[in-house]
Amino acid sequence: MKKIALIIALAMLIGLSVNTSADANEKYRIVWSHYTGWEPWQFIMESGIMDKWASKYNCQVEIILVNDYIESINMYTAGQFDGCTMTNMDALAIPAIGGIDSTALIIGDFSNGNDGIVLLNGDSVKDLKGRKLRIVELSVSHYLLTRALEMNGMTERDLTLINTSDADIAGLFITESERDPKAAVCTWNPPLMQVRNVKGANLVFDSSKIPGEIIDSLVVRSDLPDNAKKALVGAWFEAMSIMSSRSKEGQNAIKAMAKFAGGTLREFQAQLKTTAMFYKAQEAADFARSAKIKETMEYVRTFSFDHGLYGENAPDKDVVGIEFADGSVIGDKGNVKLRFPAKYMQMAADGDL
C-alpha cells in the first residue's frame, strides 16, 4: 500500500513539474495602438526590456501594434490577445460589458490636455449652442463633450453632433473652416494639434479641466498568470525610469518613440506635456487607491449607460461591477468585470519585482 502511495505521489510530482514547465514556456500576446502614452510599448519591445523581464519570470511576451484602436480592443475581447492598451471608458464599454473579466494592470497616464473642443468665432463652451460639431461619437471625446456641457449648464440637445472618424476629423474641420464661420470639433491628439493651428480657431475646453478622468491603461485578462503580470509591470516601469531620466539613454528613448508615432520630436514632446504620465510606480499605485478614480468611474458608467453602451437589454448601470484597490465595488458585486488594483504597481514601487 505504501508502495502504491509512493508511485501515486511520484506521478503527481512528475505531472506538476511538466505543468510548471509548460507554464514557463507560455507565450502571451499584448496589443497596443498609437497614442502618446502608449508609444513606450514599442520601445520596450525593441530595446529588449520586455525580453529581459519575461526571461526573469519564465514566460514569453509578444507586443504587437494594431493601428486601429477600436479593432485592437475588439481583438482582445474576442480572445486574440491577453492584454490591450485602452482608456478606462473603453475598458468598461467593450470587454467588461462584453463579459470579459478585465484588470487595469498598469495605469500609465491620464489625459491632461490631449483631448479638447475647438471652434471658430467663439471663446467658450456656451458658444457651441446651435452649432454642428464634428466628433467621434461614443468615444472619450464624446465623454469629454458631455462633461464640458454639464459643467456649463448645457446638454447635447443644445447642438448637433456629426459622427466623424478620427482619421478624417482634422481634414474635414480644416476644409470647413474656410467656408463655415461656426465650424466646431471635439477630438484628441494628434488631430487636436492640427485643428488648433487653423487660423481663428480657439480651444474652449480640454481634458486638463477634468484631470484624472480620461485614464490610459494596459488592460489584461484578470486570470492572466501572476508571472506574466509581474513581467509586464516590471518592463513598463523600467521604461518609465529611462524615459523620465535626463540621460542620453532617456533622450534616445523619446526620439525613438517620436519616430514610432510618425511625428517630429518637437510634436511628441508637446503631446507629452499634455499627458500626465505616471513615471513613478508609486504615483500610479497611489492614483489607483485614490477617491478620484471611484468618482471618475461613476461618471463613466453613467455616461456609458445613458448612451446605450450597456446594450438595450441592460436594466440599469449596476449590471456590471467595477472593483477598486480597496476591494470596494460599484455595481453588481456578483458580476465584477473591471478591476483597478494597485498590487503590482505597488510591488514595482517597493522594488519587489
Model-derived segments and spans:
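Positively charged n-region of N-terminal signal peptides that target proteins for export
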Residues: 1-5
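Bacterial N-terminal signal peptides
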Residues: 7-16
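Sec/Tat signal peptide C-region and signal peptidase I cleavage site
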Residues: 18-24
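Short, glycine-/small- and polar/acidic-enriched structural segments
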Residues: 25-173, 178-189, 204-206, 212, ...
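Sec-exported extracytoplasmic/periplasmic mature domains
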Residues: 46, 55, 77-78, 96, ...
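Pocket-lining segment of extracytoplasmic ligand-binding domains
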Residues: 162, 168-266
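Secondary-structure end/capping motifs
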Residues: 226-314
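Conserved C-terminal helix/tail region of periplasmic/extracytoplasmic solute-binding proteins
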Residues: 300-353
